[in-house]
């Protein structure tokens, strides 16, 4: 595979994640009171919900910013992988608990069942891993 094809694949993965993070962060911020209420109702995070209500959308937007900066893309992909893994772990805990709480994700993602959301997250974890595999480990600051 040519170097440019690898870059295009890495770009597509990064832009998919940017769209996801900007969309969900924006939806959470526009429906802030609902997002806060939903986080407060989750059993394992009630004591930190006041911090998470701000931290989650800020981290999502920060990850998107890192992904857009080509020189910081690998860092953004690692941040994205960490966020998606944490979100997926939480979803797995929710599925295992048998509780029927609403998803606190923003926009149409929030309408998914927990099982659908688990699959959705696993797909985006896969996209992130593909992005890491195909993104260059070193970025040239200038072309010669």
Which ranges hold each PLM region?
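Membrane-interfacial helix-loop segments of redox and metal-homeostasis proteins
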Residues: 1-144
């Amino acid at each position: 595979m040519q170097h440019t094809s690898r870059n295009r694949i890495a770009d597509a993965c990064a832009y998919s994640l940017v769209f996801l993070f900007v969309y969900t962060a924006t939806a959470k911020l526009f429906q802030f009171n609902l997002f806060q209420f939903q986080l407060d109702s989750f059993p394992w995070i009630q004591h930190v919900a006041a911090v998470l209500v701000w931290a989650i959308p800020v981290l999502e937007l920060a990850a998107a910013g890192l992904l857009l900066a080509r020189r910081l893309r690998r860092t953004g992909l690692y941040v994205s992988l960490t966020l998606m893994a944490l979100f997926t772990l939480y979803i797995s805990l929710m599925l295992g608990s048998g509780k029927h709480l609403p998803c606190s994700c923003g926009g149409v993602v929030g309408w998914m069942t927990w099982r659908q959301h688990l699959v959705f997250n696993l797909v985006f974890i896969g996209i992130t891993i593909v992005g890491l595999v195909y993104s260059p480990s070193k970025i040239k600051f200038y072309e010669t």
